[in-house]
Amino acid sequence: MTQWIAGNWLAGKGEAMNSLNPFSSEEIWQGDAATAEQVEQAVSAAREALTTWRKTDLSERQAVVEKFAELVKEHSEHIAHTIAEETGKPLWETRTEAGAMVGKIAISLRAYHERTGEKQKDIAGTAAVLRHRPLGVMAVFGPYNFPGHLPNGHIVPALLSGNTVVFKPSELTPKVAQETMKLWEQAGLPKGVLNMVQGARPTGEALAGSKGIDGLLFTGSANTGHILHRQYAGQPGKMLALEMGGNNPMVISKSYGELDATVYTIIQSAFISAGQRCTCARRLYLPQGIEGDAILNRLVEATAKIRIGGPFAEPQPFMGPQISERAADGIIAAQANLVSLGGEVLLEAIRGQGAIVSPAIIEVSNVAELPDEEYFGPLLQVVRYQDLPDAVELANDTRYGLSAGLVSTDDSEWQYFIDNIRAGIVNRNRQLTGASGDAPFGGPGASGNLRPSAYYAADYCAYPMASMEGEQTELPAQLSPGIAL
């Protein structure tokens, strides 16, 4: 039973699916995808449940969400184990994701009251009241890299605001999604308030194209996001929020400070989660001369020693595999393409067991036209620059704009950087993948259009209703011209 529709676990009626552990290639889940008809059943169930859920007192909605948070905390080790098993990420890392699921719920509760609650003030004897109302039926598309944490950051705010939801997880992480839905079921969520449809592209297309949804929250690739954007053109009545990827630049100044701390920050930025975070550094800008040489030599040396392995190996690895062998092959192909364009391999990506790919560092300063691509894996491109304005100009040469970073102890350099860089998340002397749940997450250009995560997700799950209210009608001392009573 792979679909959760109207509070019932159902078998899919579409094509067969399975999920493999990307390290061992062992099958860990199997089922059948939802058909277009089943997707419509889920949307209809959500529409029917909306009538009651939107008028359910906030305290009751909040109680269900808080019960879910308790269950996530209680079962955090099981969740972490399932994420590790299905994504291949090391268990130490997936434990942090399970913890983040609980933390994001607390943020969402606070955000509801601060951003979409009810506010009132008096204006010349009239009550000016701001209320918020749910959008309706929301579709949530989840990614595979954080299959528990990221969908949670959309589903929880949507439910708190009184929306009902149809969730379509990544077809690469169906088991994590299924285990998470079981916790929602245990939390006492009424039937139809949250539904899940499993499947690949046909299932996603059916959900995105359903006339019964009022909004769609998407986290995933730029290519898929752009397809959705075109699909929703001419439909201003539907809310579409896209969180996509980035070709993220990291600039290292000559005034970088301590060498090993800088190298560690680069490694954490480029190779955490085997490079499968949308904020990972893809392009590294190093100064020409001995300062840049020292960093590059130490970086290659340290990266070559990174421990890579299965999710449950002891001692724990820093990196696991790519999500699939297809994804792993894509990184090897990207490396070959950069070499064909004139890139020099300083550290070669090599295929290992399952979907393992070792880190690659490629010098691409002599590549005439560097492809503006998000290589979603452990592939770091190195470019040498002359001065900071040169580095920032090169860093901004991308259609994306998700994250960027500067390593520098010089305050004036940091001021120049934040005044001129084009990105939504900009860090100084910290890894690019570090972001606060209280801050907007996203960026301009091909990286997305809104910021519907964590604290700011509340803004995209409810619409504001503004009212001017008086106890009774009033006749002014002076009537408007042209009116006689």
UniProtKB/Swiss-Prot annotation:
* Pathway this chain belongs to: Amino-acid degradation; L-arginine degradation via AST pathway; L-glutamate and succinate from L-arginine: step 4/5
Disulfides per UniProt: none
Please give one Pfam family short name: Aldedh
- Protein's recorded name: N-succinylglutamate 5-semialdehyde dehydrogenase
Q: What gene makes this protein?
A: astD
Organism placement in taxonomy: Bacteria, Pseudomonadati, Pseudomonadota, Gammaproteobacteria, Vibrionales
Q: What is its EC number?
A: 1.2.1.71
Against NCBIfam families, the record matches this protein to: arg_catab_astD (TIGR03240), PRK09457.1 (NF006992)
To which species is this protein native? Photobacterium profundum (strain SS9)
Give the protein's function.
Answer: Catalyzes the NAD-dependent reduction of succinylglutamate semialdehyde into succinylglutamate.
> Of which family is this protein a member?
Belongs to the aldehyde dehydrogenase family. AstD subfamily.
